[in-house]
């Protein structure tokens, strides 16, 4: 995920945009940045969209005390929480129920949520276009339910 030289030619402008993108803290700022980039530089290449998506995902994960996100299997992510995460433990069972069959929770020395991001039941079926929206929806639910 990067800003190609063909999208923003000026190194100074590119550096400024990297700084501003790194400062994104929520969905509103993420949407504003997308609009600004399109207004100033035209349609975003896939690499820039990926960069913005990664920054939003990291920001939202940080807000719910996630210290590490790791891909486990093809359509499975592991969210490792900070050991002292201030989450509402009583809200974990309803969250597990909401994502029944797609979410697991364990307390290996630190709290870990394992999330199957794809809603597709068929193995091998390409559901990659839904990766980002499904993960963001899950992080939003974590924020609303647990924090």
Regions found by a protein language model. Name each.
Residues 1-147:
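Accessory helical-bundle/CTD segments and flexible terminal tails appended to RecA-like ATPase motors
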């Amino acid at each position: 995920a990067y800003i190609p030289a063909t999208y923003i030619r000026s190194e100074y402008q590119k550096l400024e945009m990297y700084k501003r993108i790194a400062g994104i803290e929520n969905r509103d700022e993420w949407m504003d940045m997308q609009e600004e980039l399109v207004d100033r530089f035209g349609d975003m290449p896939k690499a820039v969209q990926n960069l913005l998506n990664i920054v939003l995902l990291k920001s939202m994960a940080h807000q719910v005390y996630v210290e590490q996100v790791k891909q486990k299997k093809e359509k499975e992510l592991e969210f490792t929480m900070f050991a002292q995460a201030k989450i509402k433990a009583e809200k974990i069972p309803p969250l597990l129920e909401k994502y029944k069959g797609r979410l697991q929770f364990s307390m290996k020395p630190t709290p870990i949520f394992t999330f199957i991001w794809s809603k597709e039941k068929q193995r091998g079926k390409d559901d990659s276009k839904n990766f980002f929206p499904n993960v963001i929806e899950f992080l939003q639910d974590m924020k609303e339910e647990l924090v």
